[in-house]
A protein has these predicted regions:
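ATP-dependent helicase/translocase motor core
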Residues: 1-71, 76-192
Length: 192
């Protein structure tokens, strides 16, 4: 038996994190998206040459429905603490306007809800942190309730309307992250 400390980040995701997510009721085909690249990388210009920087890629993004991300998860190998990826997860959650940032090393989860009470984030919204064992990851409905609070979808009609698909492409393309944020922002202002 290989020690958990010897496993790579990818192994931690496949052997510990994904099974914990699935056990909490998440549909692995429609609600879980792995290795999500959301920027192509910063462009650097030097003289007449250009070069792309490193693209930003989230380890896992959880969706309640298509185009409605409710959590971003950053994993680290087991030589790190469970919360070692939190700064990166928070950065991605802020960029993608996702209400929950999660970090894990395969021993458990550190979850930061960006809208409840406690510390204030860069966007002026409060942040609260919670630790969870592998067998106590939040369910889709729990994170959906949090999403509704984060986006101030206070009526049932507002919540239902936000679930209506606003984009469909037979080729499987989806809006870029900044387009999705703009669409949701317009929806939010129309519903409030």
């Amino acid at each position: 038996m290989v020690s958990k400390k010897a496993l790579s980040e990818r192994d931690i995701i496949s052997k510990y994190i994904l099974p914990a997510i699935e056990q909490s009721g998440w549909n692995m085909q429609t609600q879980v998206n792995e290795e999500v690249s959301f920027t192509d990388g910063r462009i650097f210009v030097k003289g007449r040459k250009t070069k792309r920087g490193i693209r930003k890629r989230a380890d896992i993004i959880l969706y309640y429905k298509a185009n409605i991300p409710v959590a971003v998860i950053e994993a680290k190998d087991n030589n790190h603490t469970a919360g070692a990826g939190m700064q990166q997860a928070l950065e991605y959650a802020e960029m993608l306007d996702i209400p929950v940032a999660v970090a894990s090393n395969g021993d458990g989860f550190v979850i930061q809800y960006r809208n409840n009470c406690g510390q204030i984030g860069n966007n002026g919204k409060p942040i609260v942190t919670e630790n969870a064992d592998l067998d106590h990851f939040p369910t889709p409905d729990e994170l959906w309730d949090n999403y509704k609070k984060y986006n101030k979808l206070e009526t049932e009609k507002a919540a239902e309307t936000s679930l209506c698909p606003y984009f469909f492409d037979a080729a499987g393309r989806t809006p870029r992250y900044y387009q999705r944020i703009a669409i949701i922002s317009v929806q939010r202002h129309r519903l409030v």
